[in-house]
């Protein structure tokens, strides 16, 4: 088990014996001492901020686990239909997304409601390349079509291996900057074919713009 100690600088999580809770090592080879603090209020370094653990992990599990995670769930079917309705100009997307959101707003059900027009609006995310906790290059600032729908997908399916595909589908992956990501061209929307596969099958050609 762990406990938290507060100091003037931050809260540091420690083991029962009083030693700091170490995880991995930073790029300089120094052990990371985790803290929940976010200095800028928006962005974190490798050791800052809360740790994500969406699905229950068995006690004392480390690099491997037999924890079952959903690969495909009913909420995804509803969100797929909602996105299709939006893209084809039909009504009903808001009703479907509201149904999905209701699980997270049981105590305040009125907060779950979202409308078709809201889903068709821009994203709430502040895009831009980040250095030292500040956006130094906003890059492309054009509104994102169906941006709120994109936000809803990110909130509902966080840590479920969806986001890259969503970003490509909404035209964000190859146009927007965020954190340490800068767009590098449309060819990045597909992965390169592994060299071993190309070598074993001379009829295959590498995807464009990959060496």
Regions found by a protein language model. Name each.
Residues 18-45, 109-140:
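Surface-exposed intrinsically disordered loops and tails
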Residues 61-71, 101, 116-211:
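Long, intrinsically disordered, low-complexity segments
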Residues 5, 38, 53-56, 75, ...:
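Small/flexible residues
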Residues 1-2:
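Short, exposed "boundary/linker" segments that immediately precede the start
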Residues 7-73:
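Flexible, polar/acidic helix-loop-strand segments at domain edges
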Residues 8-10, 69-104, 146-156, 161:
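Extended, hydrophobic/aromatic-rich amphipathic alpha-helical segments that build helical scaffolds
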Residues 53, 57-59, 108-115:
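Glycine- and aromatic-rich loop/turn segments at beta-sheet edges
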Residues 16-17, 106, 155, 173:
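Short loop/turn segments at secondary-structure transitions that flank enzyme active sites
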């Amino acid at each position: 088990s762990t406990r938290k100690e507060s100091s003037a600088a931050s809260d540091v999580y420690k083991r029962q014996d009083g030693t700091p809770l170490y995880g991995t090592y930073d790029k300089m080879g120094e052990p990371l001492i985790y803290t929940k603090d976010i200095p800028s209020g928006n962005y974190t370094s490798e050791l800052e901020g809360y740790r994500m653990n969406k699905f229950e992990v068995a006690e004392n599990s480390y690099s491997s686990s037999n924890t079952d995670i959903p690969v495909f769930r009913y909420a995804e079917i509803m969100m797929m239909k909602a996105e299709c309705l939006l893209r084809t100009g039909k009504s009903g997307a808001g009703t479907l997304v509201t149904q999905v959101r209701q699980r997270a707003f049981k105590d305040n059900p009125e907060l779950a409601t979202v409308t078709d027009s809201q889903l068709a609006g821009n994203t709430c995310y502040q895009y831009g390349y980040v250095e030292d906790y500040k956006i130094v290059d906003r890059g492309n600032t054009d509104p994102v079509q169906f941006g709120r729908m994109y936000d809803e997908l990110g909130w509902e399916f966080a840590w479920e291996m969806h986001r890259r595909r969503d970003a490509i589908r909404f035209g964000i992956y190859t146009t927007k900057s965020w954190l340490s990501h800068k767009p590098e061209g449309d060819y990045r929307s597909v992965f390169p074919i592994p060299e071993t596969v190309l070598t074993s099958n001379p009829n295959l050609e590498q995807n464009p713009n990959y060496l």
